[in-house]
Amino acid sequence: MINDIADLIKIQSKNIEHYNKYPIALLLFIMLILEVPSSFLSESNESSIAFDLTFNLLNALVLTFIEAILFVYWFGRIGKNHSFLSFLRYDAMLSIAANIPVIAILLITQNFEESSWIAIIGGLIAVSYIIYMFSVNLALATGSSGKYAFGAILIVVLIQLIYGVLI
């Protein structure tokens, strides 16, 4: 599993069915465990850490299921039919792979004020890398074009923004 996560970080995804060998419960558990340091490192002053942690854990779980549903529909439109559980496993693996560099960036930028250029640039680098990593890996895993996978990721980002505003 560690090699597969490292490959995803290096943007060298295997076919989506390759990741079906991992139990979904384990993947979701690891994904949620990695939300804990993210919550502590990016805690806001407006609420308690317990609230932030609970909120982030629920968000991660709900959005992972929503993303898997979207991917089943989106890639099914072009004949790249994979099961919901395949996309759920793959999305959980991508989330694990994305959280590792984000935690590293949060560790580096936590010593700077939120309004400093270093924190802003670090945040932009993290967001850009995640969008790029998700898009390219998704294209490689499904055998679709990079533009089509990028469209799916843009829809995911839009859903996350709307979800974040409504909640």
State each model region's role.
Residues 1-90, 95:
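Selected alpha-helical membrane-embedding segments in polytopic membrane proteins
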Residues 33-38, 98-101, 156-165:
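Aromatic-anchored segments of alpha-helical transmembrane domains
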Residues 39-47, 104-112, 165-167:
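Juxtamembrane "helix-exit" motif on the non-cytosolic side of transmembrane helices
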Residues 49-56, 86, 113-123, 149:
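Non-cytosolic membrane-interface motifs at loop->transmembrane helix junctions
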Residues 61, 96-104, 124, 161:
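Mid-bilayer segments of alpha-helical transmembrane spans in multi-pass integral membrane proteins
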Residues 73-78, 106-110, 135-145:
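A cytosolic-side transmembrane-helix exit/cap motif
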Residues 91-114:
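C-terminal halves and exits of single transmembrane alpha-helices
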Residues 115-167:
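Terminal transmembrane helical module of multi-pass membrane proteins
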